[in-house]
Curated annotation (Swiss-Prot):
Belongs to the eIF-2B alpha/beta/delta subunits family. Component of the translation initiation factor 2B (eIF2B) complex which is a heterodecamer of two sets of five different subunits: alpha, beta, gamma, delta and epsilon. Subunits alpha, beta and delta comprise a regulatory subcomplex and subunits epsilon and gamma comprise a catalytic subcomplex. Within the complex, the hexameric regulatory complex resides at the center, with the two heterodimeric catalytic subcomplexes bound on opposite sides. This is Translation initiation factor eIF2B subunit alpha. Acts as a component of the translation initiation factor 2B (eIF2B) complex, which catalyzes the exchange of GDP for GTP on eukaryotic initiation factor 2 (eIF2) gamma subunit. Its guanine nucleotide exchange factor activity is repressed when bound to eIF2 complex phosphorylated on the alpha subunit, thereby limiting the amount of methionyl-initiator methionine tRNA available to the ribosome and consequently global translation is repressed. One of its GO terms (molecular function) is guanyl-nucleotide exchange factor activity. InterPro entries: eIF2B_alpha/beta/delta, elF-2B_alpha_N, IF-2B-related, IF_2B-like_C, NagB/RpiA_transferase-like.
Amino acid sequence: MVQESIISSFRGKLENDPSKSTSLATVETLLEVLDRSRATTVAEFQNELNQVVAALEKTDYSSTSIRSAADLFTRFTSLAPAALLDQEDFSQVLDLYRQRARSFIKNVRGSRAKISKCARLFFTHHMNILTHSYSKVVLETILDAHKSGYHLHVWVTESQPDASGKLVFEELKKNGVPTTLVLDSCVGYVMERIQAVLVGAEGVMETGGIINKIGTVNVCIIAKSRHVPVYVCAETIKFVREFPLNQADIPQEFKYRTSVIERNNLELEHPDVDYTAPEFLTLIITDVGAMKPEAVGEELIKMYI
């Protein structure tokens, strides 16, 4: 019953606030678990978290984002001095965990603003930018650049099969950003007039590649053939300890929603995401700065030390 209320709370966070990322909703939900916890040992608390994370991954939200956010939340929150862990009163340990969790979430909430500020370094006036799919951090980055006085023209792919690009198109138009909506199959045609590709990521892999909305790899391959830089805007909470080398290496739970997997007929289904290898990416723009794709593995090591 408690777990059902937690999952309901998670869904509510995303449904009531369209601007909230799956990653942020995940860590806020795990904080609720921590606040309610009456665990008396580290193992008992970890078991509580693991059960909730497993339930979150069975929702139809991005399993990639849930996995990475939960892993980093657990890692950051559960660091505690050995002397404190040896005490009989585990409530003091939980209090420290709660304090660290709130600090972690505060940093996550400020991630997009840091990315937007960093990304300005790569914009020029009268720049043509191409973006694919609906990424909240990419949208905020473009709007921030527009408000800062950059004159940009944004080309947005439809991003089928759910046409999520149309949401980006409408949002940019509403905010006065010159925007053109193009067919996914038109990317090769328009690329010759594009100065930069800007995409988000559901997950940044240990390889330095990204998992993102289906069609992203097509856009990035075409961009490289035209010598157009590809910038990935992604919070470090989306860094994942996975090492795919090709499409076949993507975990099944990343490729398909749970409801699709449960139908047990994946041969008839299209994957939601694809993998773009690091050689097709120029920079990963994050809340800790811009980095080359090959630096992601080192950054992950720092996070988990």
